[in-house]
């Protein structure tokens, strides 16, 4: 049974869930933009679970479980979760193993990279990037030649802030490239030009990381907290 409730008032959604006698309700967004976590406070189902979209604890009494793995929540960090933890083996994250990669092949030069350049990419949203990562990336660029940093062009202010940071570090701005929004299949195809994907630390990559791994790009990360 599928019900489209995207335009239904919140309390009507709660009422409908109770009428349908849903056994388990899963919050796939958590504390993220345009989420509906507040509906779970009304108890839409006897069992309510936090999963996938927000891997941190929701810190509430109305979410009973979180689905995770040992990388996402090591035993040492479980004390920080209000939810009981359901551990899946290996990875908690389901991925589409049939993601389409565009058959229209591109070259590095199509994205303004020299043919023999080394491309370090971080295509996470800019809000995830902190001064810690920027300092590390700056040192890499200072100590290497023909290395380029590929970032996501998410908004004008974020882009300008990043450019100004590297200018203040005396980094040649021509070595900082910004990836525009493309269709997912075209994005996957261009991502293959990256040599290494550099993750952010406080908020790690999610879909962007699985995309990189899907097209064979190694990921360098650090477990966040």
Regions found by a protein language model. Name each.
Residues 1-62, 70-78, 149-225:
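Conserved nucleotide-cofactor-binding alpha/beta core module
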Residues 47, 64, 84, 116-119:
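A generic secondary-structure signal marking the coil-to-beta-strand transition
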Residues 90-183, 190:
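Conserved catalytic-core segment of nucleotide-activated headgroup transferases in glycan assembly
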């Amino acid at each position: 049974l599928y019900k489209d409730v995207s335009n239904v008032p919140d309390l009507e959604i709660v009422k409908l869930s109770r009428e349908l006698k849903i056994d388990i309700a899963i919050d796939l967004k958590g504390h993220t933009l345009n989420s509906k976590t507040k509906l779970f406070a009304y108890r839409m189902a006897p069992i309510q679970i936090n999963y996938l979209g927000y891997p941190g604890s929701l810190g509430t009494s109305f979410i009973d479980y979180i689905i995770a793995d040992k990388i996402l929540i090591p035993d040492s960090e479980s004390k920080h979760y209000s939810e009981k933890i359901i551990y899946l083996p290996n990875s908690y994250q389901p991925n589409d193993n049939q993601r389409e990669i565009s058959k229209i092949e591109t070259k590095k030069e199509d994205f303004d990279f020299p043919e023999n350049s080394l491309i370090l990419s971080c295509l996470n949203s800019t809000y995830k990037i902190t001064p810690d990562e920027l300092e590390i990336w700056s040192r890499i660029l200072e100590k290497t030649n023909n290395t380029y940093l590929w970032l996501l062009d998410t908004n004008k202010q974020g882009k300008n802030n990043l450019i100004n940071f590297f200018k203040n570090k005396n980094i040649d701005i021509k070595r900082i490239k910004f990836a525009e929004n493309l269709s997912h299949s075209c994005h996957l195809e261009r991502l293959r030009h990256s040599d290494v994907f550099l993750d952010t630390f406080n908020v790690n990559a999610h879909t962007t990381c699985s995309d990189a791994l899907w097209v064979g790009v190694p990921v360098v990360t650090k477990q966040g907290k």
